[in-house]
């Protein structure tokens, strides 16, 4: 196969990056309300959602060397296949245990998906041209993510507004569409992502797993020695708590105000879309302000 140019690598990277976030945009307006529709209480929704965070926390560092050991393509294909399985299960889940499994699978997906696409882009860019500037592509990915999530959320709101499709509830339709788009994204990934070099083998994976506890210890040590780092981590921690609370309670409160969960989800679609478009604009403007 002909070697990719820098421009081709960037185009493929941004295409895959957008496809990675599009299903997320579709599910954002309906996640909480769909679980409520299936019988979960707010406290149960909070508990099942923790599965994702716990799995990511447990796997993030140990799986960090998988891309080096097996190759970015293998890891990303596995991650996106797990995401597809999670979305398919989300569409039919009707119990606490099944929703817990859905979120645990999402945790596996996010742990595996964290990093390989970016590293592939950097390595492929440098393989095409050792002097190429890859930072603009990485920076533009934030804009692409914002735009695709906004598009997915807007599409989700439109699908919900159209109402149920046969026996499928209006809140379930966006999840099914998200699963279909995830399947398309998986096929596109197989076509577009071409490895630039051989995988490093099992030794790289063993080294990553062995180094994980030491890296955690070093990170904790840095936090203890640096008040600036501790403050930054604290900001992220409290911001995360606030966002999770906001994203969990807003749909429920809106459903109470308008008197209909489906109408609330339909309104959340364009509202989320506008928010993510602003995020995309901010990501695009950031390089100009630095």
Question: Could you tell me what each predicted segment is?
Answer:
Residues 1-8, 192-234:
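Juxtamembrane intracellular "pre-TM" segments in multi-pass secondary transporters
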Residues 2-58, 91, 227-276:
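Helix-loop boundary and gating motifs at the non-cytosolic
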Residues 18, 86, 96-113, 237:
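Hydrophobic core of transmembrane alpha-helices in multi-pass small-molecule transporters
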Residues 37, 149-175, 251-260, 284-289:
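Transmembrane alpha-helix termini and helix-breaking/packing motifs in multi-pass membrane transporters
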Residues 58-71, 160, 281-290:
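Helix-to-loop junctions at the C-terminal end of transmembrane segments
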Residues 74-89, 179:
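Structural signature of the two symmetry-related core transmembrane helices
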Residues 102-146:
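Cytoplasmic helix-loop-helix junction between adjacent transmembrane helices
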Residues 169-191:
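Symmetry-related core transmembrane helices of the 12-TM Major Facilitator Superfamily/SLC fold
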